[in-house]
Amino acid sequence: MAKRSIKSETSPELQLGRPVTAPDSPETARLDRVPNPQKDTDYLARFTVPEFTSLCPVTGQPDFAHLVIDYAPGPWLVESKSLKLYLASFRNHGAFHEDCTVAIGKRLATELKPKWLRIGGYWYPRGGIPIDVFWQTGKLPKGLWVPDQGVAPYRGRG
């Protein structure tokens, strides 16, 4: 099967299918987007990231989260390899849970211009307290089915 060359809006060539070094920070990470061939159809796309990591900006200790990103694509789709690299750029980035979660949602909303987007950040306990952070762009398109994010509230051994 012949390779198909897909050009993205953000760069002449996608990162997909090429060796790429991990970005140093979320600010320098590139998100590739491709035209949505179903832009006139309301549907939901979900990315589940069960092993997201970042650093506490105060202690430098690692923080861990389970992210669920739901979006109703508009004119653009996010290319998943570039999303993976963008999310990996947080591994050495110091920010509070709320900032990481909301920054990811806002960056995706800015780049993709979706009809609707939400992100749930389910952070594992630090200091004995789990933090769940939720952000969305506005009202859900009428008639769009959105399943529950499927992440139970944190329960220790109790």
UniProtKB/Swiss-Prot annotation:
Compartments in which it is found: Cytoplasm
GO molecular function ontology, one term from the record: preQ1 synthase activity
Pathway: tRNA modification; tRNA-queuosine biosynthesis
Protein family membership: Belongs to the GTP cyclohydrolase I family. QueF type 1 subfamily.
EC number: 1.7.1.13
GO CC annotation terms, alphabetical: cytoplasm
Keywords, in A-Z order: Cytoplasm, NADP, Oxidoreductase, Queuosine biosynthesis
Binding of substrate, residues: V78, E79, S80, H97, E98
Active site per the UniProt annotation: C56 (thioimide intermediate), D63 (proton donor)
Protein name per UniProt: NADPH-dependent 7-cyano-7-deazaguanine reductase
Broadest EC class assigned to this enzyme: oxidoreductase
Record GO biological process: queuosine biosynthetic process; tRNA modification
Swiss-Prot/TrEMBL catalytic activity: 7-aminomethyl-7-carbaguanine + 2 NADP(+) = 7-cyano-7-deazaguanine + 2 NADPH + 3 H(+)
Entries under InterPro entries matching the protein: GTP-CH-I_C/QueF, NADPH_dep_7-cyano-7-deazaG_red, QueF, QueF_type1
Residue numbers spanned by region Disordered: 1-37
Biased composition (Basic and acidic residues): 27-37
Function per UniProt: Catalyzes the NADPH-dependent reduction of 7-cyano-7-deazaguanine (preQ0) to 7-aminomethyl-7-deazaguanine (preQ1).
